[in-house]
């Protein structure tokens, strides 16, 4: 009986870790690394926060494409350019990267720490 409990616990830990991972083959960059990418025409910058969050404070290089409507608007993005994704903390942007990967975008990058880590 104790063995079954250990197995169940191991499965729960595995599922938790898998849910917390930002995704396979998703590059992570810091906000300091992000600054060096501005002006690069081979990059697309999207902010997946809500419109209200975006209006309150955003980085001028980023286009607002809220996570909840990302699947409907992903066709506006080029699959030939890298997509840099940001949110408030890095969690929604990690989810957005997974969504984009599933839709066939091969080069997506998550900004670690999101706007919480940003400073001009």
What are the residue ranges of the model-derived segments?
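Extracytoplasmic/periplasmic/luminal assembly and interaction segments
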Residues: 52-84
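Short Asp/Glu-rich motifs
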Residues: 57, 119-120
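Conserved beta-strand segments of alpha/beta enzyme cores
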Residues: 44, 61-63, 107-109
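Hydrophobic residues at beta-strand termini and immediately following loops
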Residues: 29, 65, 111
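Active-site loop/turn elements of alpha/beta-hydrolase fold enzymes
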Residues: 48-50, 67, 113
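Catalytic cysteine-centered active loop of the rhodanese-like fold, especially the PTP/DSP P-loop
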Residues: 71, 77-119
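Flexible, polar/low-complexity N-terminal or interdomain linker segments that lie immediately upstream
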Residues: 1-44, 48-56
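Charged, low-complexity surface patches
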Residues: 27, 63, 89
């Amino acid at each position: 009986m104790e063995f079954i409990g250990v197995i169940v616990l191991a499965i729960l830990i595995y599922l938790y870790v898998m849910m917390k991972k930002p995704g396979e083959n998703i590059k992570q960059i810091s906000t300091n690394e992000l600054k060096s990418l501005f002006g690069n025409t081979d990059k697309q910058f999207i902010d997946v926060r809500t419109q209200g969050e975006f209006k309150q404070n955003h980085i001028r290089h980023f286009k607002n494409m809220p996570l909840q409507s990302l699947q409907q608007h992903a066709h506006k993005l080029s699959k030939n350019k890298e997509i840099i994704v940001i949110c408030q903390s890095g969690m929604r942007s990690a989810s957005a990267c997974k969504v984009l990967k599933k839709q066939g975008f091969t080069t997506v990058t998550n900004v670690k720490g999101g706007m919480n880590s940003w400073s001009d």
